[in-house]
């Protein structure tokens, strides 16, 4: 008996401990649900807070609480289910025939534990669709919080993209493209890294690129065939020709200045078949001051007229001008008009045939003899040679 009693005590203590633990667990589960209700119809009551959800119901609260207490085992299953399952389980607690136990859920407020992942998923969805939603009323957040969440979502992708780009650039090491060289150009000049040629091969007269003999042109910065280069030239022939053409100065065409070639005092212009002929010759005359003559008709057909000049007797001057305007005919020179221009002294005109040049000079001598009776002295010192119908070839 004693042994049985002694042996039964440990078994009873174990059963007692197990039963006490199950009772304490049930009490904790019942205490976790806070019930707040008021009796009467039409009064709003609050459903117990399961995992942060507050449910507002209306109707007969007394019948609803009795059904909820009688099925407390079902309330424990609600804690481990989703919000939609909770809504279905709470609706199934009331009997289908009882109209007073109808529950209307007006407002659902999720707890803060579920708020963060849902908000991040929603903002990610909005960024993918290219839209902007305003969920301040539902989530209780402002625009600054939403923008902060979107920036946090964007920054990892941008950083990852930059990292991949930098990794890709670091993987491409510049090397010389000459066959058999493949020199690392990371420490070379920018020019050689850009064109992928080392400094030694850029000056070589002949290199092999992709199995072909080439030479690097320093002005084109490209590889050309060896035949396009001259000896001891680092640039191709085509580029050198353009370069030399730019450096050469164009030779300007200087116009012919007649004043520098010909003397003003011996300038001659002629009219041959319609070109005028002007000749200048130096003559020396002595004119008086006390005379006034009228045009005199000569026997040879010349008409001479002189204007009064201003000067002293026996004055010697030069620069007289003898000009003729003539036209060529089949029988020689036709009758034309001759002007004798004397600077600062007057103008003498004569009209007649140029073929009578001898008579013209004889008329001048007659004029000098007739003027002696009137007190005028006209003594030609030098006479120009007679003009004939032949002219030098350089006047034509």
Curated annotation (Swiss-Prot):
A motif (Bipartite nuclear localization signal) lies at residues 233-249. Zn(2+) 1 binds at residues 176, 181, 198, 201. SUPFAM superfamilies: SBT domain (SSF103612). It comes from Arabidopsis thaliana (Mouse-ear cress). A zinc finger (SBP-type) spans 173-250. Zn(2+) 2 binds at residues 217, 220, 224, 236. Induction: Negatively regulated by microRNAs miR156 and miR157. GO terms for molecular function: DNA-binding transcription factor activity; sequence-specific DNA binding; zinc ion binding. GO terms for cellular component: nucleus. The gene is SPL10. Trans-acting factor that binds specifically to the consensus nucleotide sequence 5'-TNCGTACAA-3'. GO terms for biological process: leaf shaping; negative regulation of auxin metabolic process; positive regulation of DNA-templated transcription; regulation of DNA-templated transcription; regulation of timing of transition from vegetative to reproductive phase. It is found in: Nucleus. Residues 74-104 are annotated as: Disordered. This is Squamosa promoter-binding-like protein 10. The SBP-type zinc finger is required for the binding to DNA. Binds 2 Zn(2+) ions per subunit. Keywords: DNA-binding, Metal-binding, Nucleus, Transcription, Transcription regulation, Zinc, Zinc-finger.
């Amino acid at each position: 008996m004693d042994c049985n009693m002694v042996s039964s005590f440990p078994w009873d203590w174990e059963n007692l401990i197990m039963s006490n633990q199950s009772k304490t667990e049930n009490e904790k589960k019942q205490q976790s649900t806070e019930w707040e209700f008021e009796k009467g119809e039409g009064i709003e009551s609050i459903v117990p807070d399961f995992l942060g959800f507050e449910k507002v119901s209306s109707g007969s609260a007394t019948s609803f609480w009795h059904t909820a207490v009688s099925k407390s085992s079902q309330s424990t299953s609600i804690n481990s289910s989703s919000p939609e399952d909770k809504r279905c389980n709470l609706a199934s607690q009331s009997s289908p025939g009882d109209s007073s136990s109808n529950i209307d859920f007006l407002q659902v407020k999720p707890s803060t534990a579920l708020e963060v992942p849902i908000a991040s998923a929603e903002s990610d969805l909005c960024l993918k669709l290219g839209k902007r939603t305003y969920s301040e009323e539902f989530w209780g957040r402002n625009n600054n919080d939403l923008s902060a969440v979107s920036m946090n979502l964007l920054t990892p992708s941008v950083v990852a993209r930059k990292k991949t780009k930098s990794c890709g650039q670091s993987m491409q090491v510049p090397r010389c493209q000459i066959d058999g060289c493949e020199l690392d150009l990371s420490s070379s000049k920018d020019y050689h890294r850009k064109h992928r040629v080392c400094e030694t091969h850029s000056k070589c007269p002949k290199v092999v690129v992709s199995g072909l003999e080439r030479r690097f042109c320093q002005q084109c910065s490209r590889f050309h065939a060896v035949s396009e280069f001259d000896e001891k030239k680092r640039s191709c022939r085509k580029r050198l020709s353009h370069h030399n053409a730019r450096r050469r100065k164009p030779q300007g065409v200087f116009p012919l200045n007649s004043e520098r070639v010909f003397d003003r005092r011996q300038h001659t212009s002629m009219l041959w078949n319609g070109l005028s002929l002007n000749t200048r010759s130096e003559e020396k005359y002595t004119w008086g001051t006390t005379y006034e003559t009228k045009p005199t008709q000569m026997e040879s057909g010349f008409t001479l007229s002189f204007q009064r000049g201003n000067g002293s007797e026996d004055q010697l001057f030069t620069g007289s001008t003898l000009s003729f305007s003539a036209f060529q005919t089949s029988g020689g020179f036709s009758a034309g008009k001759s002007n004798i221009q004397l600077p600062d002294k007057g103008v003498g005109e004569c009209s007649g045939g140029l073929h009578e040049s001898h008579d013209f000079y004889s008329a001048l001598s007659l004029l000098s003899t007739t003027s002696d009776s009137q007190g005028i002295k006209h003594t030609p010192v030098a006479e120009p040679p007679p003009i004939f119908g032949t002219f030098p070839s350089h006047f034509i």
